[in-house]
Amino acid sequence: MTWVVRMAFSAMFCMNEKPFEHVLIHGLVRDSEGRKMSKSLGNGIDPLEIIDQYGADALRFTLATGNSPGNDMRFYMERVEFARNFNNKLWNASRFVFMNLEDESLLEGLTRESVKANLTLADKWIISRANRVVKEVNYNMDQFDLGIGLQKAYDFTWSEYCDWYIEIVKPRLYGHDREAKRAALYTLTYVLEKILKLLHPFIPFITEEIYSYLPTVEGYIITAEYPHYEEADDMLAEEEKMNLIMDGIRNVRNVRAEMNVPPSKKAKIIIVPTDDKRPAMEDGKEYFKSLASASEVEIQNSKDGIPEDAVSVVIDGVELFIPLDELVDFEKEKERLNKERDKALAEI
């Protein structure tokens, strides 16, 4: 801090102008026990060794997210491993995208206008979410909250683009509808490009490498314009619809997991929505089939005809029912429970 003040006063005195517009002062990097790193304690960490083992990007990611602005941070190797795993996730997601870009004829004239009519609810949702994250990250960067901005970019990349959108889009990529496939590829590459640019200041090496394989761009990412918010990409209604569908899928998955139902076992899902939630559920039928192991999705106006033993899940304005006889093999379940009872009795 002292040298900053000294330089500022010297520049004002000698040149009558500020030496720099902004100064960002960060805390110390301490060891995992909170001690200052020193030769006498022997607790110093050689960054070159970490880079050799995990890569420079993993170290940069760790240092950027390890603390809140202005505070000291504790250095944990587990956080470097966590960062390395994220970089691997980004690399594998990008490889998946590139594997589906091998048919160059699908990329001819691939623009928003050319695929607009074939964009699905999921496409619009991920484009809108990417746009919103871009806005938030830009704000955090302007406020010098670099760690918060990186965390938001990380959460979006891992939890929404990789875990949800890529899984949602697979049936279209593997299908035979050419225009549906083009719309999916456009969305995949459009959002991936934004992700790479958002992450580039933090993990420059892997993002530059991945960017070089994108057939939809030219030049280097380091000279590309940083993403900015675009009002045309803001689709809040689609986000709300998709969030409701995803919430329903999560709850169905939780029910199946609690009952030890394998993903390979399909089961019918009956949905009873309120009038305002019905359009979202209609749009989400295929997503329930592919992501919630539904053999059939039936949307009803009332609970009439639903089996009494059906397992139910309630979310915002929507009730979901799964007939128990489609989930459970009663004889096997009875056998399992009897074994657990016998084991418990033997331990008494």
Which role fits each region the language model picked out?
Residues 1:
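Mg2+/Mn2+-dependent nuclease catalytic core
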Residues 13-52, 56, 76-348:
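Feature 926 captures the class I aminoacyl-tRNA synthetase adenylation module centered on the KMSKS loop
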Residues 69-71:
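Transmembrane helix-loop junctions at the membrane interface of multipass transporters and ion channels
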